[in-house]
Amino acid sequence: MAKDLKFSEDARQAMLRGVDKLANAVKVTIGPKGRNVVLDKDYTTPLITNDGVTIAKEIELEDPYENMGAKLVQEVANKTNEIAGDGTTTATVLAQSMIQEGLKNVTSGANPVGLRQGIDKAVQVAIEALHEISQKVENKNEIAQVGAISAADEEIGRYISEAMDKVGNDGVITIEESNGFNTELEVVEGMQFDRGYQSPYMVTDSDKMIAELERPYILVTDKKISSFQDILPLLEQVVQASRPILIVADEVEGDALTNIVLNRMRGTFTAVAVKAPGFGDRRKAMLEDLAILTGAQVITDDLGLELKDASLDMLGTANKVEVTKDHTTVVDGNGDENNIDARVGQIKAQIEETDSEFDKEKLQERLAKLAGGVAVIKVGAASETELKERKLRIEDALNSTRAAVEEGIVAGGGTALVNIYQKVSEIKAEGDVETGVNIVLKALQAPVRQIAENAGLEGSIIVERLKHAEAGVGFNAATNEWVNMLEEGIVDPTKVTRSALQHAASVAAMFLTTEAVVASIPEPENNEQPGMGGMPGMM
C-alpha cells in the first residue's frame, strides 16, 4: 500500500485538528454541570454517557492525519483508565492544553527537545507536590464521598462504601445488571466457588434445596473418589466426632457416591460431596487456597498422600458451609492467619507480575475469596439506555474509590492542580526548558477553567481567584459557591490526578517532538461489475 507523508508544521497542525476534535467532544462532560455525549451504536440503542474513555474510544476520524492526533489523545485516556480507572476527561483536557500551548511555541521557533525537558521537570515537581498535600482516606464516610463525586450520585457512593466495608479493600466488587428498577448491594461472605452438591439427596433443607453444615470438617483432595473403602476409615473418625463433613474432590462417583447418599438418608452421618473448582493448574491453586483458608492438608499424589491414610488432623474446618445446586460457600474458615496472610501476599505478587488481563482477573477473584468475600452491585434503571450509562458511572466510581484508598485524596474540582501551581512556578529554568515549565503551568489551570465554562461561567475569572485562595478552598460548580473542598467532601483520588497529569505530559511531549507523519493512502475502490457471458451487451 502506498504511503503519504507530511513534515514538521503541516504534520503537527493536521494532528492538532484531530486532537481538538476528540478533546472538544470529551471535555463537555467534565464537572458537576458537564453534559452528556450520545454515541451511535450498531445494532442497538445509542449510548448516552459522560465517561471520557468510552467517548474517546468511539472516535474515528476520516482524515488519517487527524485520526493519528485523535489516537494519541485516546492513548492518554486509555492509559489513565488502565492505571487509575477514572480521570480520563481530566487527562484529555490536560493533554489538549499542553499540546496546543506547546505547538504555539514550536511554531515560534522553540526547540521541542528543550520543551520536553521543561515539561518532564515540571510534572515531576507537580507529582511530588500532590503527594505532599494528599490526605489518607480514613473512614467509610470519606470512601462514600469519593464514589459520590465520581458518579455524581450520593446513593452510588454509599453502595460502594458499604461494599468495601463488607469485603475489604482487596475484596472483589462486581457490577451486574439487575432485572428491576432499583440498584441493590448483595454480599457473599467467605469463599464461594461455582460447584454444587453432586446429589440432591445431600440437602439438609428440602424446601430451599440447600445443604447447610455447621462446624464441618473439610476434606480437600485432587483425587477421584470411586471406592467407598478409600474414605471409610476417615468417615468413621468423623462420625465419632459427631460432626458433618464437606468433601471437595476431583469427582465422587460410583460406590463412594452411592454409600454417602445412603448413609445420609439413613441419618448415619451428614456428608456433602462437591467437585473441585476450576481446571488444570488453576484448580490446583484454588484447592490450595481452600486448604489454607480452612487449615486443611491437600490430599494429593504430589505429596505421596493416600485417602485411606487420611486422619482428622489433615482435614480443614469452618464455622459454616452452605451448598446449593450451583455454588459452595465456606464461611469463617479456621485456617492459620499467618498462612492466609502469606498466601494473600503471594497472590498479590503474582497480580503485579502478570501481563494477562484474564489471569489478573482470576487472581483478583482468588485474592478476594481469601481476603474477605465478594460484593455484587446490581444496577437497576427504567430503560436499557439509562442502565448502560449508570453502569459506566458506577464502574468509574468504584475505580476512583479504590485509587483513593491506595494513594489518598486531594481537593477535587481541579483545585489541587491549581494549589500546586505556586510550587511548580518556583522551578529555576531558562530558555526552552522554562517555556516547557510554563506549558505545564498553563495546563494545571485547564480543568478548573473547563469545569467553570461547563457551568456557564467565565473560566479565567474563577482560575485567578483560585490562585489566591487558601489551600483546599475551591469553587463548587454545582452550587456556584466557594467552599473548603475537603470539608464538603468534594475530593479527587491522588492517584487519578497524578496519572492524568503524567500521561497527558507524556503524550504531549511525544507530539511536540514529532517531525514527520506517515499515513497510508487508501486503495481506490473498484466499482466495475464483472461481465456475465452469454447476455446481450455483455462479455
UniProtKB/Swiss-Prot annotation:
Any idea which GO molecular function terms this record carries? ATP binding; ATP-dependent protein folding chaperone; isomerase activity; unfolded protein binding
Reactions catalysed: ATP + H2O + a folded polypeptide = ADP + phosphate + an unfolded polypeptide
Keywords on record: ATP-binding, Chaperone, Cytoplasm, Isomerase, Nucleotide-binding, Stress response
GO CC, alphabetical: cytoplasm
> Residues that bind ATP, according to the entry?
T29, I30, G31, P32, D86, G87, T88, T89, T90, G413, N476, A477, A478, D492
EC id: 5.6.1.7
The entry's localization annotation reads:
Cytoplasm
Q: What biological-process GO terms show up in the record?
A: protein refolding
Q: What is its main location?
A: cytoplasm
- CDD domains according to UniProt: GroEL
Pfam families recorded for this chain?
Cpn60_TCP1
Which Gene3D superfamilies does this chain map to?
A: GroEL, GroEL-like equatorial domain, TCP-1-like chaperonin intermediate domain
Q: What NCBIfam families does UniProt report for this protein, alphabetically?
A: GroEL (TIGR02348), PRK00013.1 (NF000592), PRK12849.1 (NF009487), PRK12850.1 (NF009488), PRK12851.1 (NF009489)
Its quaternary organisation is: Forms a cylinder of 14 subunits composed of two heptameric rings stacked back-to-back. Interacts with the co-chaperonin GroES.
Q: Could you tell me which PANTHER family the record lists for this protein?
A: 60 KDA HEAT SHOCK PROTEIN, MITOCHONDRIAL
Q: Could you say which protein family the record assigns here?
A: Belongs to the chaperonin (HSP60) family.
- Give a short account of what the protein does: Together with its co-chaperonin GroES, plays an essential role in assisting protein folding. The GroEL-GroES system forms a nano-cage that allows encapsulation of the non-native substrate proteins and provides a physical environment optimized to promote and accelerate protein folding.
What protein name is recorded for this chain? Chaperonin GroEL
Source species: Staphylococcus epidermidis (strain ATCC 12228 / FDA PCI 1200)
